[in-house]
């Protein structure tokens, strides 16, 4: 059984094995069960980030990307907290496949990241949630949800492009979930006409694309 776009192949037995929670490909006979019962494949586990000290350099790298490549300045930053899925399910009633979450309370703002996700997934999760932090300070309120989420996904795509995360870019292009899919492709099209800073300016000034 072939997954040509992912450049991997599986025998029939492995093809029908448990899918990896992180990449969704079959785990095969080798897999790891995390503390909160999620099952991940050996490939994802080999780059899994399990502690704040491992995620810290990626967080700093994401902030540098925002400021240097995207010109999206951050005067301050939210707290970064690594937790397991059970905590987010209990405290925030997230969906089963949420990799991260940005929360805004009167006391503090926090980006939660699920422990045990692969490095490329951690990059894009950090970028998506950090975009929401930036949007709160720089974009119209209210702003259409499709533009809020579409711009966050577009920013993630630019980070993946910058770091050469080809599989992440492919996954985003073929993701049909809304409100991410349509607006991501719309903003990629607008980028060809307006450039990167033109899209950032649109997000800063418009309540929606219509």
Placement of each model-derived feature along the sequence:
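N-terminal low-structure segments adjacent to metalloprotease catalytic domains
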Residues: 1-60, 64, 68
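Pan-zinc metallopeptidase signature
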Residues: 12-25, 29-32, 36, 177-210
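Auxiliary, metal-adjacent structural segments of Zn-dependent hydrolase domains
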Residues: 49-109
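Hydrophobic (often cysteine-bearing) scaffold residues that line and stabilize catalytic clefts
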Residues: 55-58, 123, 127, 144, ...
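Active-site recognition of the HExxH zinc-binding catalytic motif
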Residues: 66, 124-137, 149-153
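Short pre-active-site segment immediately N-terminal to the catalytic Zn-binding motif
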Residues: 106-126, 139-144
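Preference for well-ordered, secondary-structure-rich cores of eukaryotic proteins
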Residues: 113, 135, 194-195
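Post-HExxH zinc-binding segment in Zn-dependent metallohydrolases
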Residues: 138-181
């Amino acid at each position: 059984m072939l997954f040509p776009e992912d450049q991997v192949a599986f025998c029939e037995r492995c093809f029908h094995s448990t899918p990896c929670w992180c990449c969704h490909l079959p785990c095969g006979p080798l897999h790891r069960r995390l503390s909160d019962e999620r099952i991940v494949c050996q490939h994802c586990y080999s780059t899994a980030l399990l502690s704040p000290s491992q995620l810290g350099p990626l967080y700093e790298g994401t902030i540098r990307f925002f400021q240097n490549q995207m010109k999206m300045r951050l005067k301050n930053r939210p707290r970064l907290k690594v937790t397991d899925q059970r905590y987010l399910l209990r405290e925030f009633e997230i969906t089963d496949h949420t990799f991260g979450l940005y929360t805004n309370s009167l006391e503090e703002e926090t980006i939660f990241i699920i422990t045990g996700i692969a490095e490329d997934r951690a990059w894009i999760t950090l970028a998506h949630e950090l975009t929401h932090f930036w949007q709160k300070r720089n974009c119209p309120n209210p702003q259409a949800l499709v533009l809020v989420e579409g711009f966050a996904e577009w920013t993630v795509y630019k980070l993946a492009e910058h770091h050469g995360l080809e599989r992440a870019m492919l996954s985003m292009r073929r993701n049909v979930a809304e409100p991410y899919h349509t607006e991501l492709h719309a903003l990629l099209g607008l980028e060809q006409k307006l450039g990167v800073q033109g899209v950032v300016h649109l997000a800063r000034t418009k309540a929606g694309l219509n």
